[in-house]
């Protein structure tokens, strides 16, 4: 059974940082078209280009991006906040990148076998971004999840989050997150969070891997 009781503090943390987490990991912005490259000038600082064509291209890009900004994306979230105990994390490397020593307690907690996974209730997670969360288990298994042509919605990707590991005073914490936007596209990070005036915010993102 994957259902374990928690005191609700971890859900509060997720709600406090979730919109920023979406931005940090590019779960929406990856779908926007990058702007036109800067024009390259010759040695005489003269360049020849068709302003009409360039302006039309810029207008098309902006129009498509506005459309994306009004679109709701679906994110497949793994059903459980999992324990980091069984992950092969390079703890020494993570420690070197921590914002400050106050995170050491939280880092040590990631090796605590008594902190176990628990099933996530997505209805408790709120977001002001244009996303809808669905359980990963509701999607096709394996690589079939990436067959976007079979969906009648815009599929952003998959998100996996760990339990939240706090220091003893619950002033700072660490979360392992991985986001995949395709078969060979994604990243895994450690999110460093800090509590300021009863609200949690992301202080630093430590990149563990990218593909």
Name the predicted role of every residue range.
Residues 170-196:
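Exposed beta-sheet edge and beta->alpha loop/turn motif
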Residues 1-172, 180-181:
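Flexible low-complexity loop/turn motifs enriched in small/helix-breaking residues
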Residues 192-210:
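Short beta-strand edge/turn micro-motifs at domain boundaries
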Residues 159-162, 178, 206-211:
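Short aromatic loop motif centered on NTY/YTY
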């Amino acid at each position: 059974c994957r259902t374990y009781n928690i005191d609700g503090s971890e859900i509060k943390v997720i709600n406090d940082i979730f919109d920023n987490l979406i931005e940090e990991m590019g779960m929406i912005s990856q779908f926007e078209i990058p702007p036109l490259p800067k024009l390259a000038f010759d040695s005489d600082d003269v360049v020849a280009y068709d302003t009409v064509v360039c302006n039309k291209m810029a207008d098309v890009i902006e129009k498509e991006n506005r459309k994306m900004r009004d679109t709701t994306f679906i994110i497949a979230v793994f059903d459980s906040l999992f324990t980091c105990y069984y992950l092969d994390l390079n703890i020494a490397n993570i420690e070197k990148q921590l914002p400050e020593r106050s995170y050491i307690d939280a880092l040590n907690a990631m090796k605590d076998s008594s902190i176990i996974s628990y099933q996530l209730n997505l209805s408790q997670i709120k977001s002001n971004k244009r996303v809808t969360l669905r359980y990963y288990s509701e999607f096709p298994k394996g690589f079939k999840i990436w067959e976007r042509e079979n969906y009648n919605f815009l599929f952003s990707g998959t998100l996996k989050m760990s339990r939240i590991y706090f220091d003893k005073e619950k002033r700072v914490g660490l979360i392992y997150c991985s986001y995949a936007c395709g078969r060979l596209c994604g990243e895994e990070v450690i999110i460093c969070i800090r509590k300021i005036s009863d609200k949690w915010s992301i202080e630093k993102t430590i990149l563990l891997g990218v593909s």
